[in-house]
């Protein structure tokens, strides 16, 4: 019996269910939207609000909410596998990473990450207040490259409930992005969750290395005194912003 998963919204889960094979097929056909039947259109509509360039769907597997991310036609490297490996590496390094899973169905890779902005209650899901770094800083998409990790640190100081813990976590995430060459570290890929009293850094998400040939690498956000230069030296030079000394 194939494992079935259910697309969902903010209310009770709808009755229509899909196997992982059907999801993988839908993700492939989503690149030719006119081929989709009505039920699969509803499924992909549930995933369209998640953002990003890759086909994805919001689902429930068992009683847990997940995001399923699929191969994209024309991928030059196995991005689903690379993201899984990178996130597992981040977890091994002590970063806050949600539960992960991986399936290969009909020769299509499916990367799965458990949602941390929903709380399951039987057949419906409670929304946890979530804000991206873009929202927390009151920024606009057109000006994201003018912001820095120091600005995110400022938001943690202003709105956070566990300031020191989250400052150190943010610094480690910046180092990870430098070391794995993740240059998609824009403000939407940093999140905050409301804990009832204030805001905490959300668990890590959307960290994917990008192959690069150049010797000089840059992140989207500013790193340290040398701006967006993706070097450990630049990060360490600005460590005081994160309440870290050079000895730390």
Where are these regions (language model features)?
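Phosphate/dinucleotide-binding and metal-coordinating scaffold of catalytic cores
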Residues: 1-187, 191-248
